[in-house]
């Protein structure tokens, strides 16, 4: 996978998002189909790039994923800009074809696109920011983590699902305590 921050524009409404470029194997590794509210998890049809937006982000941008004529314009800083005459942003178009809902922070932030789409935006055909691995039932996550670290010689972060969600759980705990304090003070 490859994640990058981008600016989206849909019919004049704009918002910052995290683009998550995924390959064809993503459906097999995740339960993405179970969190789709509308549409199918298809990110490319021939030469046409498609996008699946988080429900919150789609709502903020007022996206109509059933309108085949309106595309999202996706802007990213041009990382290869050499001088003042070079374009400061790269731009690509993708058609919104569905919405997903996982949890609020994802729903208001993430957009799924094809890995090829985001690689063309960053102008790097081999760019990767993460690899997602599905373990077989009963596999020991810590042993798998150790084996991955032993295989890869460069320093990398290997996180299991609980470690990835730690920040979210910490935030939820803080919100719970703030709610408790507000109720206690009234």
Feature locations, PLM:
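A generic structural signal for short hydrophobic patches within well-formed alpha-helices
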Residues: 27, 57-58, 118
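Basic-flanked hydrophobic alpha-helices used for secretion and membrane insertion
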Residues: 52-53, 67-155
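Peri-transmembrane interface segments
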Residues: 137, 141-186
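The feature marks short, hydrophobic/small-residue-biased sequence motifs that occur predominantly
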Residues: 5-45, 96
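Generic short beta-strand segments
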Residues: 1-6, 56, 75-79
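Short, solvent-exposed hinge/capping segments at secondary-structure junctions
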Residues: 31, 53-68
């Amino acid at each position: 996978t490859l994640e990058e921050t981008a600016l989206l524009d849909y019919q004049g409404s704009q918002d910052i998002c995290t683009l998550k470029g995924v390959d064809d194997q993503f459906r097999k590794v995740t339960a993405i189909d179970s969190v789709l509210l509308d549409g199918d998890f298809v990110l490319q049809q021939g030469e046409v790039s498609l996008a699946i937006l988080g429900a919150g982000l789609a709502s903020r941008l007022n996206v109509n994923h059933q309108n085949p004529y309106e595309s999202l314009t996706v802007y990213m800083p041009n990382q290869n800009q050499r001088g003042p005459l070079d374009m400061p942003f790269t731009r690509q178009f993708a058609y919104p074809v569905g919405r997903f809902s996982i949890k609020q922070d994802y729903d208001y932030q993430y957009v799924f696109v094809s890995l090829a789409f985001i690689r063309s935006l960053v102008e790097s055909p081999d760019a990767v920011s993460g690899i997602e691995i599905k373990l077989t039932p009963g596999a020991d996550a810590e042993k798998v983590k150790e084996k991955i670290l032993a295989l890869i010689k460069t320093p990398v972060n290997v996180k299991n699902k609980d470690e990835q969600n730690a920040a979210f759980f910490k935030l939820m705990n803080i919100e719970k305590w703030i709610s408790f304090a507000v109720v206690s003070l009234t």
